[in-house]
């Protein structure tokens, strides 16, 4: 029998006025993770404007590794570029019966995003080696997009971490900050 195990860190906090009444789990950092995919693709909008709607969708979302999704993600790169992919190995999320597929990068939920970033970097003439690292040429462009959307030209992330797919993920706020913003 297969057992799926996950560890999730949760934090809850609430406020009255400016005072935090209760906080459980600590004043932890909140990371954008997959919800940031559309903003991560913004630096490449102009050079990727010729993509099909399916390709645009797979580049800004997560998928379950089915045949249609994998085919669309693969269509973003030439077969000779497939070896550049650095997302983790995975199996399709939905399989019936016995596990028969070996783990592949294309089955990973973020393979479309990885392929689109690689394609965008190629079209912009950027070096793609180490594209998943924060010192990659596209990363400062992504930070500029966030600064523009937040209206904070000097903003810096509190921390840069590695997401489960290998891309950098940013700590945007502490859990107490939205608590204060949405207080009653």
Where are these regions (language model features)?
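Beta-lactamase-like hydrolase cores
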Residues: 1-29
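Contiguous, well-ordered alpha-helical segments that form the cores/surfaces of helical PPI scaffolds
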Residues: 10-13, 38-46, 116-120, 173
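Short, solvent-exposed loop/edge-beta patches enriched in aromatic
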Residues: 16-18, 46-52, 81
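Glycine-/proline-rich flexible loop or hinge segments
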Residues: 21-27, 51-61
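Short, conserved micro-motifs enriched in small and acidic residues
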Residues: 29-38, 167-171
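Active-site SXXK
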Residues: 32-49, 68
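Active-site-adjacent helix/loop patches that line small-molecule binding or acyl-intermediate pockets
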Residues: 54-153, 157-165, 172
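Single conserved hydrophobic/aromatic residue that forms the stacking wall/gate
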Residues: 173-174, 178-184
């Amino acid at each position: 029998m297969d057992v799926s195990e996950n560890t999730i860190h949760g934090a809850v906090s609430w406020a009255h006025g400016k005072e935090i009444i209760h906080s459980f789990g600590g004043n932890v950092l909140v990371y954008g993770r997959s919800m940031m995919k559309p903003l991560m693709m913004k630096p490449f909008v102009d050079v990727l404007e010729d993509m099909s709607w399916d390709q645009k969708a797979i580049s800004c979302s997560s998928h379950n590794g089915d045949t249609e999704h994998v085919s669309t993600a693969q269509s973003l790169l030439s077969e000779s570029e497939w070896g550049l992919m650095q997302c983790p190995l995975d199996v399709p999320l939905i399989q019936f019966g016995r596990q028969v597929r070996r783990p592949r990068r294309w089955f990973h939920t973020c393979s479309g995003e990885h392929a689109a970033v690689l394609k965008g970097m190629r079209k912009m003439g950027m070096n793609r080696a180490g594209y998943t690292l924060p010192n990659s040429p596209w990363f400062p462009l992504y930070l500029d997009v966030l600064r523009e959307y937040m209206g904070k030209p000097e903003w810096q992330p509190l921390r840069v971490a590695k997401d489960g797919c290998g891309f950098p993920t940013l700590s945007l706020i502490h859990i107490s900050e939205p608590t204060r913003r949405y207080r009653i």
